[in-house]
Amino acid sequence: MPRSRINENFIDKTFSIVANILLRIIPTTSGEKRAFTYYRDGMSAQSEGNYAEALQNYYEAMRLEIDPYDRSYILYNIGLIHTSNGEHTKALEYYFRALERNPFLPQAFNNMAVICHYRGEQAIRQGDSEVAESWFNQAAEYWKQAIALTPGNYIAAQNWLKITGRFE
C-alpha cells in the first residue's frame, strides 16, 4: 500500500488531501505526478524516521522529476537524511547539488554552515586550531549567504558571526 494512503497524523492527512487535489487540478504530466507522489511519500517516511524508505522514494522521485527547482528540494531532503545519519560529507554533497539547481535555499546554506561549525569544534577537540579556524571561516561564509537570503532568520548564527568578528 502506498505510504500516501496510510498517513495517520492530522498534518500528514491534510497535506495528502491538499496535494491530491492539486495534482488533479494543476496540469501536470503523469511523470510529474508520479515524481510528486514519491516525493510526498519520502517526506512522510522521513518524518517518521524511516530514512531508508524515504531515500528510496526520493531517489525514485529524482529519476522521474525533470524540473530543477523541484529537484532541488528532493536533493535537500536527501541531504537532511545524511545529516541525521551523521554522514556529513554526503550531506554536503547533496546540499551543494540542491543549491546548483536553486541558489535560494537558505536552509541548505544554514545546514552546510552547521556541519562546518561542527567540524571546526571537532578540530578544536583534536587540538588542531588551524583546521578549526578554516572550518569556522567556511561556516561563516555559508551563514552569511543564508542570512543574505533571509535577513530576519538565523539569529543565533548572526550572533556567532558578531561575537567571533566574522560579521561584516
UniProtKB/Swiss-Prot annotation:
Q: Which InterPro entries match?
A: PSI_Ycf3_assembly, TPR-like_helical_dom_sf, TPR_rpt, Ycf3/AcsC/BcsC/TPR_MFPF
Q: Which UniProt keyword terms apply here?
A: Chloroplast, Membrane, Photosynthesis, Plastid, Repeat, Thylakoid, TPR repeat
Indicate whether Plastid appears among the record's keywords. yes
* Cysteine disulfide links: none
* Domain of life of the source: Eukaryota
Kindly report the protein's main subcellular placement as a broad class.
plastid
Purpose: Essential for the assembly of the photosystem I (PSI) complex. May act as a chaperone-like factor to guide the assembly of the PSI subunits.
Give the protein name, as stated in the record: Photosystem I assembly protein Ycf3
**Lineage of the organism:** Eukaryota, Viridiplantae, Streptophyta, Embryophyta, Tracheophyta
